[in-house]
Amino acid sequence: MPQFDESFLSDCALADRWHFYSYTVKQLPPHPSPKPNRNRNPYPSGASHDDHQHQLHHHHHQQHHHNHHRLWKTQRQSWSPRDTNNNHSLTSNNCNCNSSNTCNSISATGNTLHSIKFHRRRKYKKLARLALSTPAIPLQMDVDVDVNVTVDREFDMEMDTPVPLKNAVCHGSISSPSTPGTCSSGIGVGGGGCSSSSNNSINSGSYSTACTPPPPTHQHHSQHQQLQGTPGGSSRVGGAGAGGGGGVPPAPPSAGSSGHKNSLKGTKLARRARSFKDDLIEKISLMRTTNNTLGRSHSPHSPRTKHGTKAPPTTEEVLRSTQTLETHVKDISNALKHFRDVILKKKLEVLPGNGTVILETIASMYSVIQTYTLNENSAIMSSATLQVYQSLGKLIKLCDEVMLSEDSGECASLSNENVREVIDLLEDAVRNLVTLAQGKLKEQDQCAFRYSGSGLGGIGAAAEIMGAVTASPGASVPGTGVMRVSAAESAAQRTSLPDIALTPKERDILEQHNVNPMRGSHSTESILRDTSPPPKPPLPNRASNPPPLPPKRRSQPSASAGTVGVGCSSSTSTSNQASPLPYAQSHNISLNSDLDCSSNISLLNYGVDRLSVRSRSPDENSQCSFDSALNHSREEEDQQQQHQHLRSFPKLAAMMDEDMDKMVSYSAAIDDKTQTPLSTGGGIAGVAGGTGGAGEGVAAAASGDGETNSNRHSNESGFVSMREFRTSTQTTDYSVQSSTKSSSSNSEIAFSISESTAVGSSSEYQQISQLVSHSQRHISSSSSSCTTTTTSSSTTTGYGSSEVEQLQQQQQQQTTTTPADLAPALPPKSIQRSSLTRHDSPGVGDELDEVQSSSGWASHRSSQSEVAELRQLSPLHHLNHHPHTASAGQLQQWHSKHHSLIEGPRLQLAGSGSCSAFDQRHLDQEPPPLPIKKKHILAYMEICSASTRSIEQHRHTMHACNISRNISHSQTMNIMPMSKELSPELEMPPALPPKNYKQRKATSMVASPTLQPVIVTTPPPSPKPTLGENGSTGRPDSRMATVCEELNDAVASEDAMPEPRSPVLDSNENVSAVDDGQTFYCHSHQLPAAEMEMSEDASSADNQPITTPQVLEEQEEPTAESRPLVAVHESVKPANVDEDEEAERADMLINMLEEVNITRYLILKKREEDGPEVKGGYIDALIVHASRVQKVADNAFCEAFITTFRTFIQPIDVIEKLTHRYTYFFCQVQDNKQKAAKETFALLVRVVNDLTSTDLTSQLLSLLVEFVYQLVCSGQLYLAKLLRNKFVEKVTLYKEPKVYGFVGELGGAGSVGGAGIAGSGGCSGTAGGGNQPSLLDLKSLEIAEQMTLLDAELFTKIEIPEVLLFAKDQCEEKSPNLNKFTEHFNKMSYWARSKILRLQDAKEREKHVNKFIKIMKHLRKMNNYNSYLALLSALDSGPIRRLEWQKGITEEVRSFCALIDSSSSFRAYRQALAETNPPCIPYIGLILQDLTFVHVGNQDYLSKGVINFSKRWQQYNIIDNMKRFKKCAYPFRRNERIIRFFDNFKDFMGEEEMWQISEKIKPRGRRPVNY
C-alpha cells in the first residue's frame, strides 16, 4: 500500500480548508487533565497514572510544535489538543506501549504530520491484528480512576470546572448508528476516541460534540472537539479531541464515505486490524446507501442485513412525498364523493368499480408511505393504518353486499346512515394517516438535516446545537461525579423518559456505584446534548459485567439501557427522530408523535436503536438490553454463553446490589411517565419504546450475564415466536425473564414486567402481566395502562440483593414445577381471554412444530396475556368472538404481521377442528377445557355481525345456523377406513336417490326460502345396490363410488321423516337453517373434533349444530324449515361410536390443511407403474399438494386437480379449505409457512377464476365477500384487489339470466345425446324468403368461416366442469353451455338436410350436396371438426344417403366418413386431432363418450376415504385437448349477411318430415321420383 494513503492526504488538506474554524486559546496548565486515548486505553499497560499525565502533557507540547510546522504561526495552538497518538513523557522520546494500548512512539523532533504517520506505520508494520475496541484493560484501572478523579477534582476546583474527567478517562464513545460498524467502543474498552462514520455518527469520547464547553483547563480539548463535530456533523473524539489523522482535523466527511478516512480507522494500523472483507462489504453497503447516516453498526462477523438501511429523505423527497400524499387524498376524496353520489342517484351498477377505484387509490397512497417506512415501528402509524384498512374494508364490503343483494335498491346496507358512517370513517381515517405521515416526513427531514454528514451541510446544525448548549457552561454542580447533569443538558436532551433531577442523596448513591454504572442509551441527539462524559464501561472479568467487546466491533451501539438520571438518554423510540420542538424543550418530546409510538423505534429504519447487538435486521424493534449496552458482538455472546449462563447467583446478587440505585431512577422515570398520554394502536399499548428498552436493560442487569444470548434470540419481532422461545429458554438459567422481556419489548409493559421479573417471583410477574394486559384491554387510552406499569415497576425498586435469593429459589422452582402449578387464577375477563390461558402449557408449541421448555412458561403466559389484549383491541374484534385454540406463539407471530387475518383465520382454525387435536393432545396437562373450544367455527364465514351477540350465544352461531344441514363432513370418512356405522355422518338426514337430481333440486329450493334457487352442481353418486329408492331405507353399501355418495350415506330411522325426502341441498353442500330462517353453509372440515364429548354436554344444547350427535329434545323448537331434519336427527344417534377414534380422525383431517408437507397422506405410484405420480390421497392432502407443486413437471397435477376436483368435492368446500389454510399460515413467521400461505392464495385465485355459473351460489359468494373483507382489514390490499376482481366477474356471471338450452326452439322435443347429433323438431321451415341469398350464391370459404365463428363463440363458453359433470350423470341442466353447443351442432345438421331435401330438382340437390362438400373441405382446413362432422352427418343421414347420387359424390362422402370410423375407437380422428394445432374446434361427442367410459370403468376410491386420483388423471388427459384448443381464437371477421342467411339454423324440418320427403323422391323399393 502507498506510504501516503487517503487519510493522510485528506488530513493535510483539511488543515488549510478548515483553518477559519480554528481559534487560538490559552496555553494548557502545566498538568492538563488526561483525556481518553484515541486508539487504546487511557493509560498504556504498565504505565502509571503520572506517566500518563506526562505523556499527555508532552503530547500537547509535541502537537503544538507540529501545528507550528504545519500551519505556521497563524494557528499555533488551534490544533494542539488533537493528537493522542503520540503520547509520551517530556523526559522520554518513547511511550510505554503494548499491543492493546498503542502510543505511537516517535522521536521528539521532527514532529511533522509526515513523520508522525511514518513512524506510526513503521512501528506497527509487523503487528498482528489488534483489538481496536477490546483491549485487555488492566485491572488496576479502578485505582487509576480514583487517582484521576482526585486530580481532576483538584483542577476542577481551581478552574471552576463543573465537569469531572472520570468518565472521560474511563468511558468510551458511543456512536450513533451511522455507518455499520464505524466506531470503536469507549475508552475503557476501546481507547477512547472511536471514530464514528464520516456521515453523521457522533461519538461521546472524552466529551460529546456540541456539549457544554469543558472547564477552561481543558479548553483545548473541548473547543477543538466542538470544532471537529461542527463542520461535518460528526465528532471524532480522541483522547485530546484528536481527529482522524494524528493531530490533524478530520476531513469533511463526504456522503457515502466509508468512515475510515480521517478517523482512527483511516490509519494503517486500524485497517490492518479490520479484515479486508469487512472493509469491502462496508464500502459496498455505503455505496448502496449514499446517505447512510444512521445505519446499524456491525460487529465484523455479525450477520449483516441484506439491504442497507434507508437514508433519511431529502427535503425535495419530503416535499414530493407530501405533495403525492395530498394528491392521493384528493383522489380518495373525489372517489368517495362519487361513491356517495352513485348511491344517492341509485346508479348501483357502477358501485363495484367505484369500490375498486378507492381500493387502488388507497393502496397507491399507502405505497408512498411505505416508501419511507413511516409506519415501520410506529404504534401511532400502525393504528392509523389499521383504521384506514378497517374503514376501507367496510366500504368494500358494502359494495359487495349491494352486488350480492337481489334487489340492490332495497339493500339494507344502502341506508343513508350506514353509507354516511362508512364514508366518513374512511375519509377521517385517510386524513389522519396522511397527517401523521406528513408529520413524520417533516421530522425525518429535520432528522436528516441535523444528522446529515454530507459535505458541510451539517455544520450549521451542529453549530446551532453547540450554541444552544453552550449557554450554561457552569450549570452543573462540582463534585457530583458521573451523574452531574447540566441545566442545558437536562433541558435539551431528548430521552424516552422525561429528565428527572437527581437529589443529592441519589447523586451520592450513583457516584458510589459508578465503578460500573449502567450504560446510557445514547442517541445521537443525547450525545450532542450531553454536557458530562458518559459513564465508563464495565471492567472485564468482573462477576457483574460481561467480557469486553470483540476486536471487530466498529461502532458501539448507542441503544443501551441506562438510567435516566445519569444524563444519558435512554430513548429508543425518539432518539433518532428530530423533535419538532426547540432544543430547550426537546426532551419533552412531541407527545402525540414519538412518545406514544411504542414501537416507533426508528422512523426510517435507521434509528439509533438498530444498533442493538441482537438486532438482526433494520426491521426489528430496538431491544435495548444489557447485552447491547455492554457492546457484545453476537460471536462473543455465543462463545461465552456456555460459561456465563452457568455463573452463580452471587454474581447476580452483586450486580443487583450495585445497580439497585439505577432502578430508583427508573421507577422515578416511570412515575413521571404516568403523566404521558399514550396511544393504543392496533391493540398495542403504546408507550415510548425506549422505556421498554430501558426496563429490559434493567432486567437484564438483574438477570446476569447469561441472559444476553437468549435475549438476543427472542426478538425477531415484537412478540417472540415459539421458535424464539425455545431458543431463549434453552440457553440460560434466566430464560424466563429474557423471553418475557423480549416478548413485551414493544411496549411500556416491558419495563414493569421485566423489572418485576428480575427481582420478583414469576407468579408476581404473571399477575403483573395479566394486570397490564387487562388494563390495556379495557382502555383505549394507555395512560391507565402506564399507571399499572408504574405500580408494578415501583414495587420492585425496593428489592435489594436479599431478594435475589428469593428470585433464585423461585426461578429454580419454576424450572421444576409444572405449568399448572404456576398458573394463577385469571381475572374473570372475556371468554376469549380465558380461552387463551388454557393453552399456556409447555407443549403449546406443538402446533408450530416447536417445543417450549417448561421454564419458559411464565414468559409464554405473559406473551399470551398481552396477545389476548391485542386480540381484544384488534380492529377485527367483532370477527373474533369465537375463542380459538391458537397458541400464544402463533399470536405473537401474528402480532408482528397483519392483525386482522389472524383473527378470522384463527377462528377458522379453531372452527375447523385443527386445534382440537392440539387441545386433546394436551388436555390432561391443562385446566378443564372451556366448552367454547368445542365449537369449531370459521369466523370468516360469519354472515351476521359477531359483535351484536353475546359471547355465549355467538360461540355457537355458525353451527347453530346449521340446523337444517343434511350432511356433515366430507372428509371425516377420508382419513382411515372405518365402517359407516362408526361415522359421524350417521347423524345426518338421509340422502336422496343418486340419480334423481331434478327432484333434489326442487326440494333444495323448498328447503329454505332464503336460498338462491340456483342449479346444484354436485356430481351424482354412482348407483349403489343397497340404497333404497327413497334414500331412507337400507344400509349403504360398503363400497363408496363417489365422495358425494359417501356424504349422502346417512342413515335415518323409518319413522323420522314426515315426508319421504328431507329438504336438503345437493350433496356436500351442507346447508343448515338457524332459527331466524337464514341459511348458511357449513363445510368439510367443520366437524367438531370432540363432538362425541359434546353430545353429553346438555348445558350446551342450545343452538347446538346438527352435526353434533346429540338428541335435540332439549332444544328450542326448530323452525319449519329445519323441523324435518331435527326429527330425523333425534333418532339417528349411533350405538357404537368410538369417540376417541372420531376425534383423532377429525384432528388428523384438519392437520393436513395445517401441515406444510403432506406427502405421507398421498399414495404415490411405484417406479415400475405407469400413470400419474400421485395415484390417490385424502381430499385435504390433494388440496395441499395442488397448492404446493412448483416444478413444471408437477404442474400437471395442479391443473388436473383444478380441472377435476368437482367430481369429489364441492367448489365452496375447496374455497373454504384454502381460505382456512391461508389464514392459518398467514400469521406464521417461518419462511416456509409464509410461502405456503402465498401458494395457497395462488391456488385460491385459480379456483375462483375457474368457477362456473353453476358453481356460484349466494353462500359461496358471501364467503368470498368475507374473505376479501379480512384481506383488506389485514392490509393485504393487493391480494384483496386481485381476489375481488375475480369476485366481481363471478357476481356478474351469477346474475346473468341462466339459459339451459334450446328446448323451446326445438319445439320441446329436442334431446341432446352423448354424440350430440340426435334431435327432432316440430318446426317445419320454408325456404329463405325475399332478398335472402341462396346457398349457391355465397362462397364456400365465407360460409365455412362464418360457421366456424359461430362454433368458436359457443365452444369458448363451454366450461370444463360442465363436460365432466355431463359425462358423469348426463344432467343437461348442469351443463347449459355444453347443451347450447351440442344443440347448435344438431340444428346445423338438420338445417343442411332440410336445405337438400326441400329442393325438387335432382340437379339442384346435387349442386347443394357438392356445395356442402366444398364447405366441409374448408372446415377441415380450419380444424373445425364440429361443423365438419355436422355437415357430414347430414350428408350421411338416412333420408339423404338412400337417394341416388353420382359416384363421385358417394365416394367423397365415404372418404369423409373414414375420419370418424368407429371401428378402431376413432383412431383416424384421434390421430388427426393430435396432429392439429390451435385454433381448433373438436368434436365434443367423442370427448363425452370417453369421459363416460372412464367414469364407469374406474372406482372413485382406492380405499375408504382415499380418492382415486388416477381416475381424475385420465379424465384430465381427455379434457386437456379441449382446454388447449379453447385458448386460441380464429381471426375471421363476422359477415352479417351470411349470419342472417343462417338464421341460427332454425329453419329445419323434423326427422319424420324428412323421411316422408325422401320416400317421395325415392319410394321404397322403386327408383326415385323426380318431381
UniProtKB/Swiss-Prot annotation:
Modified residues (Phosphothreonine): 524
Record keyword Phosphoprotein present: yes
SUPFAM superfamilies on file: Ras GEF
Region (Disordered): 28-85, 202-271, 287-316, 513-580, 614-646, 695-719, 728-747, 776-868, 879-898, 1013-1038
Biased composition (Basic residues): 55-73, 298-309
Keywords on record: Developmental protein, Guanine-nucleotide releasing factor, Phosphoprotein, SH3-binding
Tissue spec. comment: Ubiquitous.
InterPro entries, sorted: Ras-like_GEF (IPR008937), Ras-like_Gua-exchang_fac_N (IPR000651), Ras_G-nucl-exch_fac_CS (IPR019804), Ras_GEF_dom_sf (IPR023578), RASGEF_cat_dom (IPR001895), RASGEF_cat_dom_sf (IPR036964)
Function: Guanine nucleotide-releasing protein that binds to SH3 domain of Crk. Transduces signals from Crk to activate RAS. Also involved in MAPK activation.
Name of the protein this chain belongs to: Guanine nucleotide-releasing factor 2
Taxonomic source organism: Drosophila melanogaster (Fruit fly)
